[in-house]
Regions:
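RNA-binding accessory domains that recognize and position tRNA/RNA substrates
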Residues: 1-208, 227, 235
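Short, histidine-centered active-site or binding-site loop motifs used for metal coordination
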Residues: 92, 221-222
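Generic beta-strand/beta-sheet core signal
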Residues: 182, 204, 220-221, 251
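Short acidic/histidine-rich motifs immediately flanking catalytic phosphotransfer sites
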Residues: 213-218
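Cysteine-nucleophile active-site neighborhood
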Residues: 222-252
Length: 252
């Protein structure tokens, strides 16, 4: 494992070791307090462009499940079809793993998807810093390449456009009530929960104009990045609210 340093935008440094893909990276440093579910969190489109810190101390001990897709073409054990987080930061990475459904280690998965991973970080202290100062930009720098400093400029970047579907996708077609789901970075399990409730889900791109479509309810998914970049979606929602009394549900 190579020595690395996490440098926050205020100059605070945390030292650790690389266990994923060996490449420097920069991005927003955020934290996640879940005790399990790192495969789901890493594939959550909401984490696009972010360095995800896990506060739970031991990570990797149950490996990574396979990318298996159901009849609805949704991944069974992930929230999307790839890792969206730019990096993962943990306190203690377990090289050994055991789970009936595991097919590879977390490190193997990260390397295959070209995603850096850092272990040996005091993640709870890091979380305290983030809690006090809010989301901060950070850089993961390899100590043997001190001049290879990554940069991340999010000015004008529309992460929602990067993660949203590009065409209409229908699930449970012909089931009954129709729900239009605006994909700003929807997780697979949100779609699955809607389908399990016996509705037809019509998944549309984040900026799609659905106001002339026939449907019974509107569902707004959450997603990554700055919501100010999603003015097109806001305009369509406003038109829908002005012209119809159909129910609207938002989720975070």
């Amino acid at each position: 494992m190579k020595n690395v340093t996490l440098v926050l935008s205020d100059g605070t440094k945390f030292h650790g070791k690389s266990f994923g893909y060996d490449a420097p990276v920069a991005g927003e440093v955020v934290f996640n307090t879940a005790m399990m579910g790192y495969p789901e969190s890493l594939t959550d489109p909401s984490y696009a462009g972010q360095l995800m810190t896990l506060t739970y101390p031991l990570v990797g001990n149950y490996g990574v499940p396979p990318f298996t897709f159901g009849d609805d073409k949704l991944p069974l054990f992930m929230e999307s079809d790839k890792i969206y987080a730019s990096a993962i930061i943990v306190a203690d990475y377990s090289e050994e793993y055991s789970h009936w459904n595991a097919c590879e280690s977390l490190a193997e998965w990260l390397k295959r998807e070209h995603v850096p991973g850092v272990t040996g970080i005091d993640t709870r202290q890091l979380t305290k810093v983030l809690r006090e100062h809010g989301v901060m930009m950070g850089k993961i720098i390899f100590d043997d390449e001190p001049n290879n400093i990554p940069e991340a400029d999010y000015e004008g970047v529309n992460f929602v456009d990067k993660v949203s579907c590009k065409e209409i996708i229908k699930y449970n077609e012909g089931a009954g009530k129709k729900v239009v789901l605006v994909d700003c970075g929807v997780k697979a399990n949100i779609i699955r929960c809607l389908v399990n409730r016996g509705v037809e889900v019509i998944r549309v791109p984040w900026n799609y104009d659905y106001t002339d479509m026939e449907f019974d309810g509107l569902f707004l998914a959450n997603g990554p990045g700055d919501p100010d970049m999603c003015q097109d979606a806001v305009d369509v929602i406003r038109r829908q609210m002005n012209n119809s009394r159909k129910p609207i549900c938002g989720i975070c």
